[in-house]
Swiss-Prot record:
CC annotations in GO: cytoplasm
Gene that encodes the chain: RCS3
SUPFAM superfamilies per UniProt: Tryptophan synthase beta subunit-like PLP-dependent enzymes
Protein name, as recorded: Cysteine synthase
One Gene Ontology biological process: cysteine biosynthetic process from serine
Species for this entry: Oryza sativa subsp. japonica
Molecular function terms, GO-annotated: cysteine synthase activity
């Protein structure tokens, strides 16, 4: 507890949320609307999933489903939810086992292990379905285990309804017209979108999914490079009725935009942020959106993707550098 006059957080969980918004200025050619990015890259562990790491564990504790030091937490993850859970598990004293497709970045593996999590890699061709299946197998053999089920857990969208949505409404003084959010579990777009539409039913909600795995648009699941979205199935927590439209973005478009955001806006973001930005720009370029305000969620920090295709060419260049005499 901070003394009077001090502003010191009681523990790391108190630092979650209240992330800033910033206008995009250099990548918005041809836009009729303004675009403001919600920087979830500024969470304690650098992603929007810090929110649900907190909410799912806290919710399970309040319901008496888990106990620190006794319960073993298990979760399938593409990485960022795992990190959100791992720092929470470390702070609260839980053993955590995570199942993750082997295609996810090396940084994710290292960070998860740094927090003490046990990591089980699954066949990348099976995507998140493979990770979910492995988590179920482990839980069936392990007493005192509990799967948090981010794709089905109501505590996922609930935290966005209680925090992310109100934060956007407050920061924009209620002037937000459009929300653009990538869809992984669907928790962010569902909780945030529900809150915003309750404040103003005219607000439009746009989801983003990979062109290569456009399930929500009626396509087939497939491999793609946009880590964190496009799980290959319709998540249970996603309320598709909130979506006014789903925008498809290719992996190449997402990667290119993520690079441009670093070079032109000074924002080092992940590939899914690039995808969300591409979608937001497309929506902002529509004549009917002239003068409106688009808020786009940037879910994660770019440093988590240094070993991925996003920085492949820069990594090679950096590795081949030699010192000057």
């Amino acid at each position: 507890m901070a003394e009077s006059g001090q502003s010191i957080a009681s523990d790391v969980t108190a630092l979650i949320g209240n992330t800033p918004l910033v206008y995009l200025n250099k990548v918005v050619d041809g836009c009729e609307a303004q675009i403001a990015a919600k920087l979830e890259i500024m969470e304690p562990c650098s992603s929007v999933k810090d929110r649900i790491g907190y909410s799912m564990i806290t919710d399970a504790e309040e319901k008496g489903l888990i106990t620190p030091g006794k319960s073993v937490l298990i979760e399938p993850t593409s990485g960022n939810t795992g990190i959100g859970l791992a720092f929470m598990a470390a702070a609260k004293g839980y053993k955590l086992i995570l199942t993750m497709p082997a295609s996810m970045s090396m940084e994710r593996r290292i960070i998860l292990k740094a927090f003490g999590a046990e990591l089980v890699l699954t066949d990348p061709l099976l995507g998140m379905k493979g990770a979910i299946q492995k988590a179920d197998e482990l839980a069936a053999k392990m007493p005192n285990s509990y799967i948090l089920q981010q794709f089905e857990n109501p505590a996922n969208p609930k935290i966005h309804y209680e925090t992310t949505g109100p934060e956007i409404w407050k920061a924009t003084a209620g002037k937000v017209d459009i929300l653009v959010s990538g869809i992984g579990t669907g928790g962010t777009v569902t909780g945030t979108g529900k809150y915003l539409k309750e404040q103003n039913p005219e607000i439009k909600i746009y989801g983003v999914e990979p062109t290569e795995s456009a399930i929500l648009s009626g396509g087939r699941p497939g491999p793609h490079k946009i880590q964190g979205i496009g799980a290959g199935f319709v998540p249970g927590v996603l309320d598709v009725n909130l979506l006014d439209e789903v925008v498809q973005v290719s992996s190449d478009e997402a990667i290119s935009m993520a690079k441009q955001l670093a070079l032109k806006e000074g924002l080092l973001v992940g590939i899914s942020s690039g995808a969300a930005a591409v979608a937001a720009i497309r929506v902002a370029q529509r004549p009917e959106n002239k003068g409106k305000l688009v808020v786009v969620v940037f879910p994660s920090f770019g440093e988590r993707y240094l070993s991925s295709v996003l920085f492949e060419s820069i990594k090679r260049e950096a590795e081949n550098m030699v010192f000057e005499p």
